[in-house]
């Protein structure tokens, strides 16, 4: 291979490595968890929203919640069998201990969790003192927007 060809290949490789990576964007609206007559008043007015980015296999979320009747106590990344089907916790969130506030978290997803994200089976749940099994929850949906990182 000639010297100019090698230089061209090296320059092209350096340019590709220096290019910004695209991160996939996700959103979710947090709605009250399923309720019955015993906990309806504790969750019915609660709302929230979030944005998330996926860089490689690392999912990062940031969001807010409001209208809780008691302070939030925690939150989690969760995986269900499909969108709308509740499932198990796969990671923890940092949640403000308040009736309205913010939350955030980062999790490294494995292959099965990445597949679940693509089929919208990953969701976020925020718990509170009066609703320890979930005050609000929302399934992650592709925002249709990629972000430069």
Region spans (language model):
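Bacterial N-terminal signal peptides that target proteins for export
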Residues: 1-10
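Metal-centered catalytic cores of metalloenzymes
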Residues: 2, 20-75, 79-149
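N-terminal signal peptide c-region/cleavage motif recognized by signal peptidases
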Residues: 13, 18-20
């Amino acid at each position: 291979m000639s010297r100019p060809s090698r230089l061209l290949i090296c320059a092209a490789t350096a340019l590709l490595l220096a290019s910004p990576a695209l991160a996939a964007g996700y959103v979710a609206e947090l709605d009250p968890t399923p309720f019955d007559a015993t906990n309806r008043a504790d969750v019915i007015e609660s709302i929230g929203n979030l944005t998330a980015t996926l860089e490689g296999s690392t999912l990062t979320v940031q969001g807010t919640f409001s209208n809780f009747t008691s302070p939030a106590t925690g939150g989690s990344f969760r995986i269900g069998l499909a969108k709308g089907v509740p499932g198990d916790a796969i990671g923890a969130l940092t949640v403000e201990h308040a009736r309205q506030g913010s939350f955030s978290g980062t999790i490294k997803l494995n292959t099965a969790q990445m597949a679940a994200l693509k089929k919208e089976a990953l969701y976020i749940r925020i718990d509170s003192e009066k609703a320890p099994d979930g005050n609000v929850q929302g399934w992650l949906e592709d925002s249709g927007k990629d972000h430069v990182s």
